[in-house]
Every structure is written in structure tokens, then in C-alpha cells.
């Protein structure tokens, strides 16, 4: 597997967020020199882009100076605000929940990442994009997918399978959205297709209905063949990184009193299949009949 990275654009995500670090443009700039870094990840701070926030602009300019991609995150952005956001150099968006939103961004030159994850599922709404008219600027993504879903359903292959069998998308268009379009967008120009000059990274499936993988080739070498995995040299994991990965929660002992608060708090309404929330007023207590439950964010980095 080749693992590629997009550098974080919004850590912390908001001024009130307590993250493990504060990554300004100086903290991430040197990482652009790594060949596996493809660009700047989802620019969530659309307000900062539109209003020329100096820190946001510095991150965008740094990415452009290294000739890297800048991914977007701008649900519902419209009109002149969307014009400004795209003109700043944001090349794609994965937060489209409606055809109207997706078409507005396509018309301005963005690529659309059609998301079908665990919580946010937009394939049904955006499947009409997968036609010769629009598909060349569309690709698939999951954004967030739970490990159990990965094991039971699959990843990008699941989206392609659903597009073909549930929404009637042409199989060739679906496979291109899963492979070739994404490779082209990220400037991985020798991947995503079987052709002269391309790396021979590809899988052989049984049919478009089941998408069962029969063979997997990596750089022309057959590594998976009908249930048998060829031996390969696994990379060594540095002890330092292993220790860091298992030492990420630094939380003081919590008690019920830590979660008691009689003040009025905002109520977030949920939309099935989306991660966008609605403003449902205020409440000062849990109400099971109205399905008002309490949520809390516990800072885990500093303890």
C-alpha cells in the first residue's frame, strides 16, 4: 500500500478547541518537501478564506508555493462567498449534500469528492453526477469510516459497487471515479489506469455485482491470488512511534460532578445520513422523551 498525506489546515479547528498542538503555516511548511505529501487538507475555515485571515492565507500561499493541492470543506457556501473561496485556490470539496451544492462548485471548476462514509452518506444524492457530462471531475471518498464498516462492507470498492448496483451508474464510470479521476486530481499521473508507462498497481475482481477481489498486483508483482497472500517484507515500526501511538490519552479522573451543569446549553439537531446539524434551541437538562441527551468534549492531550 502506498500511503499519501494531506497536511492539516485547521488544527485547532476553532479558537475554542483544545487540540494537541497549534499547527500554523510555519509548523507544517517543511513537510511539503516529503514526496508522499500531496497538499493541504480540507480548508474548513471558509470564513477565514473569504475574509483574508492572515494565518489562513499564509497556509494557502505556502501550499501553492510548493505546487500542491488544496482540498476544500465548505458545505452550503454560495454566491460571491463561494467565488472567493474557489478563487483562493481551493480545488475540491467533499461536503456536498445536494446536487445544487455540487453543481455550483463544479461550475466554478472544483472537483467533487462524492462521500459515502459511516455517518455522512451522500452517494444517493450525488449519483446523478456520475454521467459523461460531470463524472470527469468527480471521485469517491469516505471521509470517516468505522473499522467495522471497512471490514464488513469495504472502502472505495463499496462505493463503486453501490453506485453500479443500487443507483445504475455505468460500471466504467464508477471504476474511473474510484481510481483514475482521484489519481489525476492528486497528480499521481502514472497511477489509476492500466496503460503503457503506468505503474502496474491494480486488482482483478470477479464481477461488478459482487466486487470480490481475486488478484492484487503491486508494481507488476502478484501479491494476492484467490485467497493466498505472497510473502513480503513488512516495514519496521520504530519503537518511539509505537510508544507514542499507545500514549495519547492524558485525562484526569472524571466524576459525575464534572458533567453537571444547570445552565442553558444549545441543542444540536441531527440529520440522518449527514454530519450537518441544525439549531434546535436551548435546554438545561436531559429529556429522554424529546431525545435531548448530553454530550461532552474531554480534553485528552494535557490532562
Q: How would you describe each model-predicted region?
A:
Residues 3-7, 38-42, 70-72, 92-94, ...:
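Hydrophobic faces of well-ordered beta-strands that scaffold small-molecule active sites
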Residues 1-69, 133:
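Divalent-metal coordination cores built from histidine and acidic residues
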Residues 151-168, 172-303:
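Active-site microenvironment of metallo-dependent hydrolases
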Residues 81, 87, 91-191, 203-211:
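Active-site-adjacent C-terminal substructures of enzyme catalytic domains
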Residues 42-99, 116, 120:
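Divalent metal-binding pocket/active-site signature
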Residues 1-3, 34-37, 65-68, 88, ...:
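Short coil/turn connectors at secondary-structure junctions
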Amino acid at each position: 500500500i502506498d500511503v499519501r498525506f494531506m497536511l492539516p489546515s485547521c488544527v485547532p479547528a476553532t479558537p475554542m478547541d483544545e487540540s494537541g498542538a497549534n499547527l500554523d503555516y510555519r509548523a507544517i511548511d517543511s513537510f511539503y518537501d516529503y514526496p508522499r505529501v500531496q497538499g493541504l487538507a480540507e480548508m474548513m475555515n471558509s470564513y477565514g478564506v473569504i475574509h483574508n485571515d492572515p494565518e489562513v492565507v499564509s497556509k494557502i500561499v505556502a501550499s501553492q508555493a510548493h505546487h500542491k493541492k488544496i482540498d476544500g470543506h465548505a458545505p452550503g457556501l454560495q454566491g460571491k462567498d463561494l467565488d472567493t473561496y474557489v478563487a483562493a485556490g481551493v480545488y475540491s470539496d467533499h461536503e456536498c449534500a445536494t446536487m445544487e451544492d455540487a453543481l455550483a462548485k463544479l461550475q466554478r471548476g472544483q472537483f467533487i469528492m462524492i462521500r459515502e462514509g459511516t455517518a455522512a452518506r451522500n452517494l444517493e444524492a450525488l449519483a446523478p453526477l456520475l454521467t459523461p457530462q460531470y463524472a470527469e471531475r468527480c471521485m469517491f471518498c469516505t471521509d470517516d469510516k468505522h473499522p467495522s464498516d471497512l471490514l464488513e462492507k469495504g472502502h472505495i470498492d463499496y462505493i463503486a459497487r453501490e453506485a453500479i448496483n443500487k443507483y445504475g451508474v455505468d460500471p466504467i464510470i464508477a471504476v474511473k471515479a474510484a481510481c483514475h479521476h482521484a489519481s489525476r486530481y492528486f497528480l499521481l499521473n502514472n497511477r489509476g489506469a492500466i496503460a503503457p508507462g503506468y505503474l502496474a498497481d491494480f486488482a482483478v475482481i470477479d464481477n461488478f455485482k459482487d466486487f470480490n477481489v481475486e488478484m492484487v498486483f503491486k508494481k507488476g508483482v502478484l501479491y494476492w491470488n484467490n485467497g493466498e497472500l505472497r510473502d513480503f517484507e513488512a516495514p519496521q515500526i520504530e519503537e518511539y512511534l509505537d510508544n507514542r501511538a499507545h500514549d495519547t490519552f492524558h485525562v484526569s479522573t472524571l466524576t459525575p460532578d464534572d458533567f453537571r451543569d444547570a445552565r442553558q446549553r444549545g441543542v444540536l439537531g441531527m440529520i440522518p445520513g449527514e454530519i450537518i446539524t441544525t439549531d434546535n434551541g436551548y435546554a438545561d437538562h436531559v429529556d429522554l422523551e424529546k431525545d435531548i441527551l448530553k454530550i461532552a468534549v474531554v480534553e485528552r492531550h494535557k490532562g
